[in-house]
Amino acid sequence: MKIKYFFCVLLLIVSVYAYAQGEAVGNDWVAMGLKGKVKSVKTSIYFAEEKGNDFAKGSTLSQGIYPVKKIKQYSEMERMGVKAFFIQFLVNIIPSAITFDKNGFITEKWRYDDIFPKKIVYTYDKKHRLIDKSTFVHEFLETKDTLIYNTKGQLEKEVLDLKTKDETIYTYTYNIDGELIQRNFKKVEDLPLFKEIYIYNNKRLVNKELYQFDQLIWRGLYEYGAEGELIKAISQKIDDFIWHSKYTYDQNNHLKEEYLLINESEKNGFLNRFGSDRRLTYHLTFSTNYLCEYKYTDDKQGNWVKMITYEQGVPILYVERKIEYF
């Protein structure tokens, strides 16, 4: 049955993305859906073995729910402002160890899902703004991401130094209301490679366009509900595909369901369901009618410490999180 796990991964890594205006403002505890003053989270992944009415940890899985290549691809897409809620949840379930400061910001993260372990160190200024993110392999600096803010506290420039390649520079432009209206990507001394244009209505992002050398290559349209929640997103990669997403929420305005169609085909897309804290519980792939479900066990703080993944009703993975509190 273990082989089915890899089938589910292949289903999940289809190139489907959606953009939604930013999550609730807060620290990394909020971003990760953690409750209480969490000091550290260590995540380990095993194959699940049935043991009576419970499950035991089988052999260790060295990668996460997503393989490294897909995580890198999604991370780059996310830098461009692209989001998909079910991918956003699953991409972070990897063998790792994360440490937080008392303000809820990540200070160090170890990733164990690649050939060599990677240590990522986060540095903040006095206003808790991220100013440096450096990645080390065997104590050697692999990448260095430097963030620079203007006098208004807005992110103005970002320099990504890959060490083995040229630097990539991101510059940000805002309107008088403080809304991001343009972001440029370029290599050092080169003309801009990419340009993003953002358009707002009533403080909500309603249109986003991505240009490469002044040629439109990606477009997004977004609609919101009465409470400002994203209810519809149409993302189009020009001359390639259209992804139509609809979102529903519970009475507390928590995301409940994500319904996705690719190229308007009811046979190509996904249905995802979430718990109140946006933990994924249900993932159905329309093209194969393949169902993945996720069941959790929580600690006393309400944070999940065990997740069992099921594929077509068969338990496949046992994910364990060891959480330490201040």
What do these predicted regions represent?
Residues Q21-F326:
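Buried hydrophobic residues that stabilize the cores of well-folded domains
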